[in-house]
UniProtKB/Swiss-Prot annotation:
SUPFAM superfamilies: Zn-binding ribosomal proteins. Pfam families: Ribosomal_L33. The lineage of its organism: Bacteria, Bacillati, Cyanobacteriota, Cyanophyceae, Oscillatoriophycideae. Disulfide bonds: none annotated. This is Large ribosomal subunit protein bL33. One of its GO terms (molecular function) is structural constituent of ribosome. PANTHER family: 50S RIBOSOMAL PROTEIN L33, CHLOROPLASTIC, LARGE RIBOSOMAL SUBUNIT PROTEIN BL33C. Transmembrane segments: none annotated. Belongs to the bacterial ribosomal protein bL33 family. Keywords: Ribonucleoprotein, Ribosomal protein. GO terms for biological process: translation. One of its GO terms (cellular component) is ribonucleoprotein complex.
Length: 64
């Protein structure tokens, strides 16, 4: 018998300013992993997190 997938998904959050900002502290793109509830949050997740490459708090969006 196969079990159903859970409601929670593991997602990746990526900094939105790292791609377009040439004046950042170091090369690369900041990424965080977290989980979200598929039933409660159906859309893409956006959180303000600290970006180590930009050296400030920026908006991180969910990528697939």
């Amino acid at each position: 018998m196969a079990s159903k997938k859970g409601v929670r998904l593991i997602i990746t959050l990526e900094c939105t300013e790292c791609r377009s900002n040439p004046d950042k502290r170091s090369a690369g793109v900041s990424r965080y992993t977290t989980s979200k509830n598929r039933r409660n949050t159906t859309g893409r997740l956006e959180l303000k997190k600290f970006c180590t490459h930009c050296n400030k708090h920026t908006v991180h969006k969910e990528i697939k």
